[in-house]
């Protein structure tokens, strides 16, 4: 059976996410390490961003990279382990743009990503999910080359126990990651490809123009992903329905089974034996309905689809 969970808030402290995951009987969960709309770029991460480390295996977590104390990180690790949960995954800040044509933003993004990787390692998280970014008015090819350079610099300066996970995107504007070919190129051209993986976001994939709404659609899209990138690179799912129609290039999430994708895609994914030991995290709207947490409602639906 896949590991079900959701993105959870760390407002009030890291432990709050673990407490919410336990309350909702999740197997796994995703968090931000700090506010996703604010930069966290420690000086030492900025210094590391400007050069490559010679031996990746020698890189260890350093407190100066972290947006929290080592004591809080240790308490967090102990809490999710004692709860019997799978290791969490971190989502990087929305401000990071590894494809940026602007040198200052690119360097700042690399430094911020290095800090995210150190933070994830301190928390016992196995990976950091990041959107590849946008070259804006520059060409796709140049944007991809910049992402490859950024990824290699980040991984050379990051603890080796954390993977960098490229997320599929909806294709809004000039953002990279909406085509499987783009992600494959980044992975193939990286000198650290063994530490790169992919997050398959259902809402993004659907909005980008990859069909998912029927079981046949789902299998066809997964087969194309396998031929282009390889299912061995697929490390985590974001299970989200889409408020926007197929091929819209718009990123707006909806509760599972209530959007344009529909329930069959999720039935297909949760019952595919190839994904029986993969994390599946929801990023659906938060809130309550009739006094019931919306994450609980969506989790109930997922569990009801299991055969």
Predicted region positions:
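N-terminal pre-domain/capping segments
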Residues: 1-92, 96, 100-118
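C-terminal helical cap(s) of enzyme catalytic domains, especially alpha/beta-barrels
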Residues: 289-307
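A short, acidic, amphipathic alpha-helical segment used as a generic capping/interface helix at domain edges
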Residues: 219-230, 260-274
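Short, well-ordered coil/turn segments that N-cap beta-strands
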Residues: 1-4, 25-27, 82-88, 122-126, ...
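Active-site beta-loop-alpha junctions enriched in small/polar residues
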Residues: 7-11, 32-36, 93-95, 133-135, ...
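Acidic/histidine-rich catalytic cores of soluble enzymes
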Residues: 148-256
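Active-site acidic/histidine proton-transfer and metal-coordination neighborhood
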Residues: 81-82, 97-197, 294
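Conserved, mostly hydrophobic/aromatic
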Residues: 21, 91, 109, 120, ...
